[in-house]
Regions:
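Primarily extracytoplasmic/secreted proteins
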Residues: 1-221, 227-241
Protein backbone atom coordinates (compact mmCIF):
# COMPACT_ATOMS: atom_id res chain seq x y z
CA UNK A 1 0.00 0.00 0.00
CA UNK A 2 1.53 3.31 -1.07
CA UNK A 3 -0.91 5.55 0.79
CA UNK A 4 -1.35 5.67 4.57
CA UNK A 5 -3.40 7.77 6.93
CA UNK A 6 -0.99 9.57 9.25
CA UNK A 7 -2.91 11.92 11.57
CA UNK A 8 -6.20 13.73 12.05
CA UNK A 9 -6.53 17.24 13.47
CA UNK A 10 -9.89 18.85 14.31
CA UNK A 11 -11.63 21.73 16.05
CA UNK A 12 -15.22 22.93 16.52
CA UNK A 13 -17.45 25.57 18.04
CA UNK A 14 -20.93 25.20 19.52
CA UNK A 15 -21.55 28.95 19.36
CA UNK A 16 -21.98 31.17 16.33
CA UNK A 17 -18.59 32.19 14.94
CA UNK A 18 -17.22 33.35 11.60
CA UNK A 19 -13.83 31.66 11.76
CA UNK A 20 -12.15 28.54 13.12
CA UNK A 21 -8.52 27.40 13.03
CA UNK A 22 -7.35 23.80 12.98
CA UNK A 23 -3.80 23.56 14.32
CA UNK A 24 -1.78 21.04 12.32
CA UNK A 25 1.12 20.11 14.59
CA UNK A 26 3.90 17.84 13.39
CA UNK A 27 2.76 17.17 9.84
CA UNK A 28 5.48 15.64 7.68
CA UNK A 29 6.73 17.80 4.83
CA UNK A 30 5.40 16.70 1.41
CA UNK A 31 2.50 14.73 2.87
CA UNK A 32 -1.04 15.47 1.65
CA UNK A 33 -3.35 17.53 3.87
CA UNK A 34 -7.09 17.58 3.17
CA UNK A 35 -9.23 20.01 5.16
CA UNK A 36 -13.00 20.25 5.51
CA UNK A 37 -15.08 22.98 7.19
CA UNK A 38 -18.82 22.62 7.81
CA UNK A 39 -21.01 25.40 9.19
CA UNK A 40 -24.59 25.40 10.43
CA UNK A 41 -26.69 28.59 10.22
CA UNK A 42 -23.92 30.35 8.36
CA UNK A 43 -21.05 29.97 5.94
CA UNK A 44 -22.57 31.60 2.89
CA UNK A 45 -19.13 32.38 1.48
CA UNK A 46 -15.84 30.80 2.55
CA UNK A 47 -12.40 32.38 2.33
CA UNK A 48 -9.69 29.95 1.24
CA UNK A 49 -7.01 29.63 3.95
CA UNK A 50 -3.57 30.92 2.96
CA UNK A 51 -1.57 28.21 1.21
CA UNK A 52 -4.57 25.93 0.62
CA UNK A 53 -6.39 25.13 -2.64
CA UNK A 54 -10.18 24.94 -2.85
CA UNK A 55 -11.65 21.63 -4.05
CA UNK A 56 -15.37 22.20 -3.52
CA UNK A 57 -17.80 24.45 -1.66
CA UNK A 58 -21.57 24.71 -1.36
CA UNK A 59 -24.03 26.84 0.59
CA UNK A 60 -27.77 26.73 1.08
CA UNK A 61 -27.98 29.82 3.27
CA UNK A 62 -28.75 27.62 6.28
CA UNK A 63 -25.79 25.29 5.90
CA UNK A 64 -22.45 25.42 4.13
CA UNK A 65 -19.19 23.55 3.67
CA UNK A 66 -15.89 23.73 1.85
CA UNK A 67 -13.07 21.26 1.18
CA UNK A 68 -9.42 22.16 0.55
CA UNK A 69 -6.00 20.54 0.14
CA UNK A 70 -2.33 21.46 0.42
CA UNK A 71 1.06 19.77 0.39
CA UNK A 72 2.44 19.93 3.93
CA UNK A 73 5.42 22.13 4.71
CA UNK A 74 6.01 20.65 8.16
CA UNK A 75 5.66 24.13 9.71
CA UNK A 76 2.94 26.23 11.32
CA UNK A 77 1.98 27.34 7.80
CA UNK A 78 0.06 24.05 7.62
CA UNK A 79 -2.54 25.36 10.09
CA UNK A 80 -5.95 25.76 8.45
CA UNK A 81 -7.52 29.13 9.32
CA UNK A 82 -11.07 28.78 7.98
CA UNK A 83 -13.33 31.84 7.75
CA UNK A 84 -16.75 32.57 6.28
CA UNK A 85 -19.64 35.03 6.21
CA UNK A 86 -22.71 34.66 8.47
CA UNK A 87 -21.74 33.25 11.88
CA UNK A 88 -22.71 29.68 12.71
CA UNK A 89 -21.79 26.61 14.74
CA UNK A 90 -19.10 24.62 13.00
CA UNK A 91 -16.81 21.62 12.76
CA UNK A 92 -13.51 21.41 10.89
CA UNK A 93 -10.93 18.70 10.35
CA UNK A 94 -7.63 18.21 8.55
CA UNK A 95 -6.49 14.69 7.67
CA UNK A 96 -2.88 13.92 6.75
CA UNK A 97 -1.94 11.16 4.30
CA UNK A 98 1.42 9.93 3.02
CA UNK A 99 2.24 8.34 -0.35
CA UNK A 100 1.00 11.20 -2.50
CA UNK A 101 2.43 13.05 -5.46
CA UNK A 102 3.61 16.57 -4.63
CA UNK A 103 2.51 18.25 -7.86
CA UNK A 104 -0.72 17.90 -9.86
CA UNK A 105 -1.97 15.87 -6.90
CA UNK A 106 -5.71 16.50 -7.31
CA UNK A 107 -6.88 14.40 -10.26
CA UNK A 108 -10.65 14.91 -10.17
CA UNK A 109 -13.59 15.58 -7.85
CA UNK A 110 -17.39 15.43 -7.94
CA UNK A 111 -19.97 17.04 -5.65
CA UNK A 112 -23.41 15.61 -4.80
CA UNK A 113 -26.09 17.87 -3.31
CA UNK A 114 -29.29 16.12 -4.45
CA UNK A 115 -30.12 14.95 -0.88
CA UNK A 116 -30.23 18.51 0.46
CA UNK A 117 -33.85 19.30 1.26
CA UNK A 118 -34.59 15.63 2.03
CA UNK A 119 -34.39 13.67 5.28
CA UNK A 120 -32.39 10.51 4.62
CA UNK A 121 -30.40 7.93 6.61
CA UNK A 122 -28.16 6.86 3.71
CA UNK A 123 -26.13 9.01 1.35
CA UNK A 124 -24.08 7.74 -1.60
CA UNK A 125 -21.50 10.01 -3.21
CA UNK A 126 -21.16 10.40 -6.93
CA UNK A 127 -18.93 7.83 -8.64
CA UNK A 128 -15.38 8.28 -9.91
CA UNK A 129 -13.31 6.04 -12.18
CA UNK A 130 -9.78 6.31 -10.74
CA UNK A 131 -6.28 5.42 -11.83
CA UNK A 132 -4.97 2.28 -10.14
CA UNK A 133 -2.90 3.09 -7.05
CA UNK A 134 -4.44 6.51 -6.45
CA UNK A 135 -6.32 7.66 -3.34
CA UNK A 136 -10.08 8.21 -3.24
CA UNK A 137 -11.44 10.46 -0.46
CA UNK A 138 -15.11 11.04 0.31
CA UNK A 139 -16.10 14.04 2.46
CA UNK A 140 -19.61 14.08 3.93
CA UNK A 141 -21.30 17.21 5.32
CA UNK A 142 -24.68 17.04 7.08
CA UNK A 143 -26.91 19.98 7.89
CA UNK A 144 -27.77 18.98 11.47
CA UNK A 145 -25.84 16.57 13.67
CA UNK A 146 -28.84 15.82 15.90
CA UNK A 147 -30.64 14.09 13.06
CA UNK A 148 -27.74 12.20 11.52
CA UNK A 149 -25.73 10.81 14.41
CA UNK A 150 -27.13 11.02 17.97
CA UNK A 151 -25.94 10.05 20.49
CA UNK A 152 -22.23 10.04 19.77
CA UNK A 153 -22.01 6.31 20.55
CA UNK A 154 -24.08 5.58 17.43
CA UNK A 155 -21.40 5.95 14.81
CA UNK A 156 -21.96 6.41 11.12
CA UNK A 157 -20.69 3.64 8.86
CA UNK A 158 -19.17 3.87 5.41
CA UNK A 159 -19.40 1.18 2.76
CA UNK A 160 -16.47 -1.16 2.09
CA UNK A 161 -13.79 -0.77 0.81
CA UNK A 162 -13.75 2.79 2.22
CA UNK A 163 -12.59 3.43 5.82
CA UNK A 164 -13.42 6.42 8.02
CA UNK A 165 -10.56 8.82 8.67
CA UNK A 166 -12.51 11.30 10.78
CA UNK A 167 -16.04 12.15 11.92
CA UNK A 168 -17.69 14.55 14.34
CA UNK A 169 -19.05 12.20 17.02
CA UNK A 170 -19.02 14.57 20.00
CA UNK A 171 -21.10 17.47 18.72
CA UNK A 172 -24.48 18.40 20.10
CA UNK A 173 -27.48 18.86 17.86
CA UNK A 174 -26.55 22.51 17.39
CA UNK A 175 -23.49 21.53 15.37
CA UNK A 176 -23.22 20.06 11.89
CA UNK A 177 -22.02 16.51 11.28
CA UNK A 178 -19.13 15.71 8.96
CA UNK A 179 -16.96 12.74 8.03
CA UNK A 180 -14.05 11.89 5.76
CA UNK A 181 -13.41 8.38 4.37
CA UNK A 182 -10.56 7.05 2.22
CA UNK A 183 -9.64 4.15 -0.07
CA UNK A 184 -6.49 3.35 -2.05
CA UNK A 185 -7.60 2.03 -5.43
CA UNK A 186 -5.99 -1.23 -6.65
CA UNK A 187 -7.58 -0.92 -10.11
CA UNK A 188 -9.73 1.30 -12.31
CA UNK A 189 -13.10 0.09 -11.02
CA UNK A 190 -15.65 2.91 -10.79
CA UNK A 191 -16.43 3.51 -7.12
CA UNK A 192 -18.62 5.55 -4.77
CA UNK A 193 -18.85 5.71 -0.97
CA UNK A 194 -22.11 5.16 0.93
CA UNK A 195 -22.53 6.69 4.41
CA UNK A 196 -25.28 5.23 6.63
CA UNK A 197 -26.73 6.12 10.04
CA UNK A 198 -29.39 4.36 12.12
CA UNK A 199 -30.60 7.70 13.47
CA UNK A 200 -33.47 9.85 12.23
CA UNK A 201 -31.46 11.21 9.34
CA UNK A 202 -30.89 14.68 7.99
CA UNK A 203 -29.79 16.57 4.87
CA UNK A 204 -26.35 15.44 3.63
CA UNK A 205 -24.08 16.52 0.79
CA UNK A 206 -20.70 15.17 -0.27
CA UNK A 207 -17.68 15.50 -2.50
CA UNK A 208 -15.59 12.56 -3.70
CA UNK A 209 -11.99 13.24 -4.75
CA UNK A 210 -9.09 11.41 -6.39
CA UNK A 211 -5.48 12.19 -5.47
CA UNK A 212 -2.40 11.01 -7.35
CA UNK A 213 0.15 8.64 -5.85
CA UNK A 214 3.85 9.39 -5.71
CA UNK A 215 5.71 7.85 -8.63
CA UNK A 216 8.27 6.27 -6.32
CA UNK A 217 6.09 5.38 -3.32
CA UNK A 218 5.65 7.18 0.00
CA UNK A 219 7.00 10.73 -0.05
CA UNK A 220 6.84 11.64 3.64
CA UNK A 221 9.23 10.51 6.36
CA UNK A 222 8.67 9.47 9.94
CA UNK A 223 6.45 6.92 11.63
CA UNK A 224 2.92 6.40 10.36
CA UNK A 225 0.20 5.98 12.97
CA UNK A 226 -3.30 5.03 11.89
CA UNK A 227 -5.75 7.79 12.70
CA UNK A 228 -3.74 9.58 15.39
CA UNK A 229 -6.17 12.24 16.64
CA UNK A 230 -4.94 15.61 17.87
CA UNK A 231 -8.36 17.23 18.14
CA UNK A 232 -8.87 20.57 19.85
CA UNK A 233 -12.03 22.15 21.13
CA UNK A 234 -15.34 20.29 21.07
CA UNK A 235 -14.64 18.78 17.67
CA UNK A 236 -15.87 19.51 14.16
CA UNK A 237 -15.22 18.41 10.64
CA UNK A 238 -16.61 20.51 7.88
CA UNK A 239 -20.24 20.97 7.26
CA UNK A 240 -22.63 23.75 8.03
CA UNK A 241 -26.29 24.61 8.37
Amino acid sequence: MAFAEVSTYSNSSGSGVGSLTVTVSGAVANNLLVGQITVRNGGDAFTTPTGWTLIDTHSTGAFGYATYYRIASGTSADDAAFSWTDNGTCYAAVVEYSGNATSSVLVQSSEKTSDLGSTVTTHTTNSLTPTAGNLLLAALAVLHNAGWNTPASQTTTVSSPFSLSDENTTASGSQPYAAIAYYETPDTTTRAATFTTNDAGSEPASVIMEFAAAAGGITGTGAITEGADTSAGSGAIFSYI
